[in-house]
């Protein structure tokens, strides 16, 4: 079978517009209890059934009176009120607490702080004691102009009378009609609109609806989204993971997106790569679903049948979208099956098989489609300005979504790009946002200010510590302990090697650099290179741990390797670390000590960027040995041949060390919790953890 090509590739905005033009909003609605309505979309405007409040009530603790009875009261003339009703006394009052209904004859409330009991006179005004009543506290039912005046809450020397409600009280301030009273309908009047059509119901909307006498509300039905994975190679989570078999997780991610955006996901079992079976399963899915997502098979490979199958069932609106990652996406318009639950046109989305591509297409096509079907607007995506410290190339003709981490260094919010592979779903976990590069732009220049679309709250971005330099699994342990005391913190690591990390720190591109550079001349770690590379940058140098480096080999050490010198044996395949990495510096030091030419080692130029990548290369059988930390060998069940011990230090910019999160980090480094956590992992010594090193004065 010949290879296929993208049949109808379009820019993202055109594909989205075509999709929405063919999609029909759901025309039915359903009624749900208010208590179960959170997150649902209103089908029509919602009106109040009752006024709120439905009676005239006290907005303060105090006494209810007729306002006109207080006219003339002043600091020089206290007016006396008696407990009772107009039928029994001349100036009646009753005690009221906040929320109590007023007697029919009352039209004002005097705050309890303004009410006094005892002898009254217009001459000399002896201190009058406030009667015992509930303390007058503003509970939010009154406006800001009605708050008590703290300078005149009590007369000087007056003391509350405990255990007594006085039958006769005095006031020295005149009330206005309906002062400190919540009138009927103050919040909302029966028949007034509460919520508009197409409104997503929030927690305080639930409260307002119930307060206004509503017990049910008409909402749009959740769009039913059939999610159909394709691929003969797919297995379910928990099944044995054999080479060539792929765990099916994309459908779970898409289902979670659908739930978050107000739909009802229906995950279907994977279908093998067979066009007839695929068409049969699609037809069945469309009988009850409002739209369908077909995962994989959307590209131009020999066994990619999604596009041809959808074309045979309807119209391909787009086959290929000018985004990266995500180009193989498909948008199709399908007629409803004969036995369908409704006769509206169905939209089918062909999702790329790579998870990052699929996630981007979900955000750019599936979310607006669900919003359209629900008759509501998409939530605004929060964007933030950031600076690109280095040039970022991009492919012309495609809108590229570059995953980035963000961190504020000084007064600049800096972005750091993550690996761009479409299959690396963990980059989405680590990403703070997307940098979207337009199709007609070939890249971002160093120093450019750009807009980043956030994937997490801005507060978490402000708590991000940018860590560059050497890789070590204990950085994850450090982050975990740090989050105990600083929950909004996050370590965003960039494993570029010790040398490159120090240089990035010097350029102001990171808060902290991890390093383990051995100086061959002095036999000391890190200090000589720090003084040589960033002499003008004020820093603090703190040891994270002393760690053990050695050769990682397969279980049982099948080649009988004993040390570095054995790497030159015939048939031994080696994996090295990148140039500038401290581990590579350590290897070169030992090779020089042994008088070994690096060219004699098969794989000396085969480079990876982390200790875990070294361990994976050995564990998978790709190579026979690599130099790395003991903890990486232990994690993957490899044998370990010790070579050396080294100081693994953290170099903090002084301005960062003096910041709140920097101080928290230093406190964690000097604490017992971190030592205990590191001690639980083989290959580390913590006697010097948290110890600060001093540079020699130049």
Cite the ranges covered by each PLM segment:
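Short loop->beta-strand "edge-of-pocket" segments that line small-molecule binding or catalytic clefts
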Residues: 462-471, 565-590
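N-terminal hydrophobic or amphipathic helices and topogenic motifs
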Residues: 406, 411, 417-509, 525-538, ...
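Flexible glycine/proline-rich
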Residues: 9, 13-16, 30-35, 39, ...
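Phosphate-interaction motifs
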Residues: 2-215, 384-385, 437, 449
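Periplasmic-binding protein-like
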Residues: 536-548, 638-667, 691
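A ligand-binding cleft/hinge motif common to bilobed small-molecule-binding domains
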Residues: 514-532, 615-644
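Flexible hinge/capping segments at coil-to-helix
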Residues: 544, 553-574
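Phosphate-binding glycine-rich loops and their immediate beta-loop-alpha structural context
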Residues: 180-294, 464-493
